[in-house]
């Protein structure tokens, strides 16, 4: 449930590095445990994703499924990391002992357009735990964040609280 701008960034960076970009379609809203939005929401989402990617890995005769986990992610409570372990997903950035700062510096050295891109989080993370995740709510959050992006803000989140939106903007 990432904003569409993330897909645009992925497509652009794939072109920059000469990688084939393939989109794997998922439907988290079809997963009842995900929609309930409990403390294991990320686990349910990632389990579904890694199951799909494992099938793609096998059909492409690839050796591994990898993710973008880095050293800075390891201290956080991340149910998605548990799913990654269960599915045998490799984390090459962790294996290389790279932090977010290291990754940004390397991306800048390589001339990648996303080297200074703010961290992105799933739109579902903007909905308080226990509140059901719906397509309508996700669209509302994405639309509100798109307005902030068009206005030139870079580091922000819009959190959905029913009929109220809480806008968090970093000092820039």
Model-derived regions, located:
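ATP-dependent adenylation/nucleotidyltransferase module used to activate substrates
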Residues: 1-109, 150, 165
């Amino acid at each position: 449930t990432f904003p569409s701008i993330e897909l645009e960034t992925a497509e652009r960076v794939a072109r920059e590095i000469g990688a084939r970009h393939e989109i794997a379609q998922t439907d988290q809203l079809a997963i009842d445990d995900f929609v309930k939005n409990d403390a294991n929401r990320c686990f349910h989402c990632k389990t579904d994703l890694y199951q799909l990617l494992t099938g793609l890995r096998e059909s492409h005769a690839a050796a591994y499924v990898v993710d973008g986990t880095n050293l800075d992610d390891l201290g956080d409570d991340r149910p998605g990391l548990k799913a990654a372990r269960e599915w045998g997903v490799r984390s090459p950035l962790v294996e290389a002992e790279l932090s977010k700062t290291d990754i940004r510096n390397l991306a800048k050295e390589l001339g990648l357009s996303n080297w200074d891109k703010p961290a992105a989080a799933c739109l579902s993370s903007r909905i308080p735990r226990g509140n059901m995740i719906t397509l309508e709510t996700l669209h509302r959050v994405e639309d509100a964040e798109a307005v902030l992006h068009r206005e030139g803000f870079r580091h922000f989140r819009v959190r959905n609280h029913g009929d109220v939106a809480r806008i968090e903007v970093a000092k820039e």
